[in-house]
Each structure stands twice: as C-alpha cells, then as structure tokens.
C-alpha cells in the first residue's frame, strides 16, 4: 500500500509541477496581464503584458509593440519580469532534480537515500517556483485594483482590468505549490518501507540464529 501511495504521489507531484511550469512560462510571455476596453470604440481593445502592449482591432487584427525601455516601466512590471524569469528557472530545475528521484528511474538500491533527498530538493524548488510566480501576478492585480478605484482619476478615463494571464499565473503558482507538497509526501513515505525492510531482515537473522542454537543444544 505504501509503495502504491509513493508511486502515485511521485507521478502526481511531477505532473502538477510540469503543468505549473508550462503555465508559468505562458504567463511570462503572454501580453494579457491587463485589458483595456474603450467605451468610445468598442471594436478596439488594448492588452498589456510584461514585454509588450497590443491593440486588437476587428479589421486589422492584433498589433503589438515591445516596450522601449526597461527603466521606463512601472516598478511592478520591472520586478515581475525578474520574478517570472526566476520562477521559470526554478521550476525547470525542480523538474530536473525530482525526475532523477523517481522510483521508475533505477540508480541502484544503495542510493535510495539519495533519491529521497532529490525528491525533497525538487519539492523545495517547486515551492520556490510557485511563490515567485504568485508574487508578481498578485502584485500586478493589486496595483490594477488600486488604479481602477482611484478617485483622483476622472470617471470618463478608461481603466485597466484583469487580463487572462493573471488567472493563468495564479493557477500555475498553485499547481507548483501542490506539486511540491506531493513530492515531499512521496519522499517521506519512501523512508518507511526501507526501514521496515531492514527490520524484516534483522528479524529473519534472529530467527535463524535461534534455530541454530536449538539444533546445537539438541545435539549435545
């Protein structure tokens, strides 16, 4: 039973971490962190991401323009770029490390403890990747809400709203956190069968020694 739980936890943890990493990469590059709908022209919509701003028109389609300067960006977008890059890198390392700790990859019976440590390290990296993905999307969402309800801005001025990439980033961060938790559960459960195995071997050896002692006494 413990073996089945460990295998399921490992596969589910790696799968969720992989899903979260892919979604965090998409969140990083999609230009849909903010949406702006113009009341005067309903056929024209604006979107903003970490790297570019796009305008969507029914006749022309989507046209995007990269930001000219990194320093000219708002603080939340500058920090979000760095954190999202960090999240993508940590998520990739977490997948790589935890992959070597899976039971389906045979690296020798004497290296069970090493595989357990790899799963723990992979879980920690997935956690870090999830946190560094949740922080930027939550920060941008918070600033968007503040600007939307800013009383100093006239009512006729269009306001930015949540884009699809923010929800994608939240889902990515939660998937990475849950994947890291499952990897830790798998690592903790992988220690118990090993200990019980050693106990069974020791108990068998004691039984053999007891039988040998009885046979010796009968001969005498």
UniProtKB/Swiss-Prot annotation:
Its main location: other. It is found in: Cell junction, Tight junction; Cell membrane. Residues 31-81, 139-164 are extracellular. It is a multi-pass membrane protein. InterPro entries: Claudin, Claudin_CS, PMP22/EMP/MP20/Claudin. PROSITE patterns: CLAUDIN. Residues 1-10, 103-117, 186-220 are cytoplasmic. This is Claudin-22. The gene is CLDN22.
